[in-house]
């Protein structure tokens, strides 16, 4: 019965192929002793080998020739190791031809050794088991004693026996590991030594090969790279950086990164060219990055370093420094914005616009704390040169008669302003704040048509007719739409003259000794009606007193706002009841002579210039301090953005 049932497992084995073989070394008997003395003992251990894989049992010390281990291990069978046996069984051709000779890879070799404390371990015996013979007997567990033999070519001796249990198993989930293990077989001893040093086992493919198909590394596009990838994996692994697929968009590859990445993607030749590949041969953005991701499944994730962040923080300061440098320049007034907070606003710009819209007879008006650039100084010199152009242009320029009306109101104050403008050093404009109303078109026309006149040109035009002055006053009023002359417009223009100061209205004031009271001017034109004849004295006195009062305001550091053109008439009407109070306040300047007034004005001007220099020094210090803060610790400037000024 037993003889009939034995072939059935063999027939069943034709339909079942194992993937692993499990070997259990139980014990040995009759081993030769290697120690000296009467009771010879040995320190025995057994080396178990299938193909290129080896395992070793523990050492049983001082055994009398019968050690017991009871240790097991599992070996992975090479792909196709039992296919020949299966085909031979199906064809009844006997044993497979590869089962003997140099191609007999499916053998279990058991080598028993004696451990020597000094020198090389001594050989005790060797047993070779053909796995195909065991598999032919059936797939059940086989426990059997095998005789130990001497080394090939040595004299045969009695060396004892060893008992081993062999059982075949199958793991369906690891079928793809056959192909991977075949590619791992042709490894050099040098690579295995490196694996031991690195603490790696089979290139760490045991955990990943079970889920990868066997054709993953057989891509025809990869060519020799798929076959040589593991053989050269040790050399590439230390120098390989992250592939292009794992790099961030903000990180740029350096020369070393490009060379290492390109060298890891393309294999051209066996050996050295892999390690010394130039980055110019292939780009790190090539399509081979995808192949690299397939070959090396254990890619590190990209972590952004401080160099990526630092390259982004240092993109903005150069532009801010350029804007700050432009602010320090005299001709550039560009504002600097740091993190939404305006450090330098164009607040000094409105005085510059006033300077461009001021008519010729008036000095440039600017803020008391503003530092005038070169362009503003040149504009101030040109406006100072045109200081005495108010009374000129009666026949040459009819487009600006209203401005000439404003330039003939206080002769004494105008003369003091002229001499002061002549004595000022070059580049120091007269800084006063006056309620002036003029149009930019009139300024452009006056600058184009009026020639350069002297400082004392006013004395040649003291004979202007009162009717002509009234007509110009009506035109110079901002609210008048036409050039028509009427008594009402004439009186309105003279009333407007009361609200202005430092005007250049002609007055017969002696230049030898100025009088505190205005004198009626002499005119060569026919005299008009008596109401118009009485107004010049009142208007001149009012203009002089208001001018002195505003001079007091300027010297004390006050700043007067510029009235809009639409509010001029209302301002004239509201200032009429205050004329008496203005005269009382300006009475302390009546006893001063012309030279004393000029000296007082020059003294105040020097004080203002010193204050401007001090302000400029402070601004320069703040600029340098801000640049230093931006260079050293820019985080101090990260404040919440405020509303635009």
Swiss-Prot record:
Coiled coil: none
Region spans: Disordered: 271-299, 341-550
Main location: cytoplasm
Biased composition (Polar residues): 277-286
Entries under PROSITE patterns matching the protein: C2, FIP_RBD
Membrane topology qualifier: Peripheral membrane protein
GO MF assignments: gamma-tubulin binding; small GTPase binding
Cited SUPFAM superfamilies: C2 domain (Calcium/lipid-binding domain, CaLB), Eferin C-derminal domain-like
Biased composition (Low complexity): 357-374
GO annotations of cellular component type: early endosome; early endosome membrane; Golgi apparatus; Golgi membrane; mitochondrial outer membrane; mitochondrion; phagocytic vesicle; postsynapse
Compositionally biased intervals (Basic and acidic residues): 375-387
Keywords: Cytoplasm, Cytoplasmic vesicle, Endosome, Golgi apparatus, Membrane, Mitochondrion, Phosphoprotein, Protein transport, Transport
FIP-RBD domain boundaries: 578-640
Residues with PTM Phosphoserine: 176, 283, 286, 307, 357, 367, 391, 395, 486, 530, 539, 545, 640
Endpoints of the signal sequence: none
Chain intervals with Basic residues compositional bias: 452-463
Keyword Membrane: yes
PTM per Swiss-Prot/TrEMBL: Phosphorylated on serine and threonine residues. Phosphorylation at Ser-357 is PKA-dependent.
Any GO BP annotation: cellular response to type II interferon
Record SMART domains: C2 (SM00239)
PANTHER family: RAB11 FAMILY-INTERACTING PROTEIN 5, RAB11-RELATED
Complex formation: Interacts with RAB11FIP4. Interacts with NAPG. Interacts with RO60. Interacts with RAB11A that has been activated by GTP binding.
Function: Rab effector involved in protein trafficking from apical recycling endosomes to the apical plasma membrane. Involved in insulin granule exocytosis. May regulate V-ATPase intracellular transport in response to extracellular acidosis.
Domain notes for this protein: Binds to vesicles enriched in neutral phospholipids via its C2 domain. The interaction is favored by Mg(2+) rather than Ca(2+).
Protein name (database record): Rab11 family-interacting protein 5
Gene that this polypeptide is encoded by: Rab11fip5
């Amino acid at each position: 019965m037993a003889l009939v049932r034995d072939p059935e497992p063999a027939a069943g084995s034709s339909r079942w192929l194992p993937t692993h073989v499990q070997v259990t070394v139980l014990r040995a008997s009759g081993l030769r002793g290697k120690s000296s003395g009467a009771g010879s003992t040995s320190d025995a251990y057994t080396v178990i080998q299938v193909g290129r894989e080896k395992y070793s049992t523990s050492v049983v010390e001082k055994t009398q020739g019968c050690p017991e281990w009871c240790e097991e291990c599992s070996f992975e069978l090479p792909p196709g190791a039992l296919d020949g046996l299966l085909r031979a069984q199906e064809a009844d051709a006997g044993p497979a031809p590869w089962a003997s000779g140099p191609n007999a890879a499916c053998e279990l070799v058991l080598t028993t050794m004696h451990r020597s404390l000094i020198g090389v371990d001594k050989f005790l015996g060797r047993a070779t088991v053909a796995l195909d013979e065991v598999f032919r007997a059936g797939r059940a567990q086989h426990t059997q004693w095998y005789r130990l033999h001497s080394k090939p070519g040595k004299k045969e001796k009695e060396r004892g026996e060893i008992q081993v249990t062999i059982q075949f198993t199958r793991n369906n989930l690891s079928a793809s590991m056959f192909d991977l293990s075949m590619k791992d077989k042709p490894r050099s001893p040098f690579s295995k030594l490196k694996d031991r040093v690195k603490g790696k086992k089979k290139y760490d493919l045991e955990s990943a090969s079970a889920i990868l198909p066997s054709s993953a590394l057989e891509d025809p596009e990869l060519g020799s790279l798929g076959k040589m990838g593991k053989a050269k994996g040790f050399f590439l692994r230390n120098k390989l950086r992250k592939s292009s697929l794992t790099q961030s968009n903000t990180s740029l590859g350096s020369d070393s990164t490009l060379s290492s990445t390109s060298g890891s993607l393309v294999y051209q030749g066996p050996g050295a060219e892999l390690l010394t590949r130039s980055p110019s041969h292939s780009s790190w953005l090539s399509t081979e990055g995808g192949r690299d991701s397939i070959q090396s499944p254990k890619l590190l994730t990209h972590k952004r370093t401080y160099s990526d962040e630092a390259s982004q923080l240092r993109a903005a300061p150069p532009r801010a420094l350029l804007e700050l440098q432009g602010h320090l320049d005299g001709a550039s007034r560009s504002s600097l914005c740091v993190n939404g907070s305006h450090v330098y606003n164009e607040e000094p710009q409105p005085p510059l616009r006033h300077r461009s819209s001021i008519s010729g007879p008036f000095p440039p008006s600017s803020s008391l704390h503003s530092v005038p650039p070169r362009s503003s100084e040149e504009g101030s010199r040109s406006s100072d040169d045109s200081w005495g152009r108010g009374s000129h242009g009666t026949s040459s320029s009819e487009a600006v008669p209203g401005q000439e009306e404003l330039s003939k109101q206080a002769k004494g104050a105008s003369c003091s302003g002229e001499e002061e403008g002549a004595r000022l050093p070059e580049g120091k404009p007269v800084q006063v704040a006056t309620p002036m109303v003029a149009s930019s078109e009139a300024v452009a026309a006056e600058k184009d048509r009026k020639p350069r006149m002297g400082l004392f040109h006013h004395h040649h035009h003291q004979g202007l007719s009162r009717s002509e002055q009234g007509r110009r006053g009506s035109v110079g009023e901002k609210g008048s739409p036409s050039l028509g002359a009427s008594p009402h417009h004439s009186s309105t223009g003279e009333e407007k003259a009361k609200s202005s100061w430092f005007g250049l209205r002609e007055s017969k004031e002696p230049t030898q000794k100025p009088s505190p009271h205005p004198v009626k001017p002499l005119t060569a034109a026919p005299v008009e009606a008596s109401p118009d004849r009485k107004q010049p004295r009142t208007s001149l006195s009012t203009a002089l007193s208001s001018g002195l009062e505003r001079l007091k305001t300027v010297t004390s550091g006050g700043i007067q706002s510029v009235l809009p053109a639409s509010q001029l008439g209302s301002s004239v009407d509201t200032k009429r009841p205050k004329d008496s109070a203005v005269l009382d306040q300006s009475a302390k300047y009546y006893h001063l002579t012309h030279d004393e007034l000029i000296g007082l004005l020059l003294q105040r001007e020097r004080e203002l210039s010193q204050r401007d220099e001090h302000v400029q020094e402070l601004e320069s210090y703040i600029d340098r301090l801000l640049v230093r803060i931006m260079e050293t610790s820019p985080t101090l400037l990260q404040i919440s953005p405020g509303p635009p000024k």
